[in-house]
Amino acid sequence: MKRAPTKQPAKPAARGGERAQGRVIAAHGRHYIVAPADGGPMLQCFPRGKKSEVAVGDRVAYERTSADQGVIVEIGERRNLLYRSDQFKSKLFAANLDQLLIVLATEPYFSEDLLGRALIAAEANELKPIVVLNKIDVEAALPVARERLAPYRALGYDVLELSVKGAPDDARTQLAPRLAGHSTILLGQSGMGKSTLVNLLVPDAEAATREISAALNSGRHTTTFTRLYPLQDGGALIDSPGFQEFGLYHLTEGRLERAFPEFRPLLAHCRFYNCHHLHEPGCAILEALADGRIAPTRHALYAQLVHEASQIVR
């Protein structure tokens, strides 16, 4: 008879190796920075296992493996999770958000497609969207920018006009009350003034970025990771790298149609309950498009997003 294998004694816990709670404040690949809930020094953490589903803003449980490192063992329940996706993969932005702030500028020419997609993402995740039009001191480009944003104002979206560099005090006065006490993600194309806005609202942002970058071992690549900054008046600002595309392949057709506020009052009036709002007879959305109540650019965005959702590899 074989002897039962001798049970190996449990390895002693690493220094401070008990499970503790914290919040993810930065992410770069599979590297995460966690701020302990007890206020101790931040840690570089890695997810347990090969697959990583951790996002900035997550409340997590971690186990310390050394003085300044740990492993994330559990993700707390999320209120929401914002991410973008193409037909093959998804990229997490952040979790547990209240608001989405998208930064545009009079120049360079901003992408209306990206603006529309960001607003749809906000609506689909029940986030309050805030649109900032920066560089209003570039007066020659201001009328065109206002004209392009007029349809969004008409839909009820909050559009703030400011000049972060030209009138920083006014910019701070407009933004601070809207951000206080809320977790807000900041999105914007390169060149829109997003970094300047972060530095205005978070005076020590550059120092914090250098510290986090060093902890992530990301060296000079300081703009390639998402990070969270606590705000003086409560709440947090989450800065995500400048982006040039915003896929929403993961949104179902049902979620998409409800993410257009101008569609919602009409959805119950289509002739067919499973109307796709593309070519169907008796479609209330298409009737509103024909008589000018819905902008052609908005319906075109809806049609494009429905097409993208049909291409996803599940």
Curated annotation (Swiss-Prot):
Protein's name in the database: Small ribosomal subunit biogenesis GTPase RsgA
Chain positions recorded as GTP binding sites: N134, K135, I136, D137, G188, Q189, S190, G191, M192, G193, K194, S195, T196
Keyword terms of this UniProt record: Cytoplasm, GTP-binding, Hydrolase, Metal-binding, Nucleotide-binding, Ribosome biogenesis, RNA-binding, rRNA-binding, Zinc
EC number: 3.6.1.-
Start and end residues of each stretch annotated as Disordered: 1-21
CP-type G domain location: 85-246
Source species: Burkholderia pseudomallei (strain 1710b)
Described purpose of this protein according to its UniProt entry: One of several proteins that assist in the late maturation steps of the functional core of the 30S ribosomal subunit. Helps release RbfA from mature subunits. May play a role in the assembly of ribosomal proteins into the subunit. Circularly permuted GTPase that catalyzes slow GTP hydrolysis, GTPase activity is stimulated by the 30S ribosomal subunit.
Main subcellular location of this protein, as a coarse class: cytoplasm
Keyword Zinc: yes
